[in-house]
Amino acid sequence: MTLDLNFLNYIYNKMISIKQINEKDIDLCYELDSKTISLWSKKQWANEFKKEGTKIFGLLFTNLIIGICVFQVVLDEAQINYFVVNKKFRKKGFGSYLMSYLIKNCEKLNLKKILLEVSQGNVTAERFYSRFDFSTVGIRKNYYKDGSHALLKEKKLITK
């Protein structure tokens, strides 16, 4: 018996989806955050859902949220405030899938660029963002609680 690769790709693509998530998903967002980078409290998550211009996308594998991207649109720019993939699903293309979706979404909105901050010591994240043509445009010294610097990254978008 041979497996049809097109059929397998079809099944795989049916298992992965991205949807805009809302305030009712706070507990799921907080849970994923707690298991990964522990960046925000539940209150901070609640505040993100209320910010004007903020969009929150969840990357789902079957019905499990395995990735989250939070970005805020201000004028003609998008600021990524949060981007994470569940540790069990890293280095399997899920983060790239979510980032590609974000970039296409921003291009459809005719935004000119995407901005983000990343810890200078987070080499894995830096490599990830460089694959999507984010370049370093600045630095915020001693930005994080541990004294590490934040690199300001920017990706220029192709608009019509």
Regions found by a protein language model. Name each.
Residues K113, S119, E154-L157:
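Conserved catalytic core of the tyrosine transesterase superfamily
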Residues T2-I11, H149-K160:
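Terminal substrate-recognition subdomain of acyl/acetyltransferases
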Residues G95, M99, N122-A125, N142-G147:
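Short glycine/proline-centered loop/turn elements that form peptide/ligand docking sites
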Residues L115-E117, S130-L151:
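Conserved catalytic-core motifs of GNAT/GCN5-like acyltransferases
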Residues I11, I16, Q20-K88, M99-Y101, ...:
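Acetyl-CoA-dependent GNAT
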Residues L102-C106, I114, A125:
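Short hydrophobic clusters on alpha-helical segments that form packing/core surfaces
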Residues N86-K92, Q120-N122:
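Active-site acidic-Proline motif in GNAT/NAT acetyltransferases
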Residues K92, L109-K112:
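Short coil/turn segments at alpha/beta junctions that flank glycine-rich nucleotide-binding fingerprints
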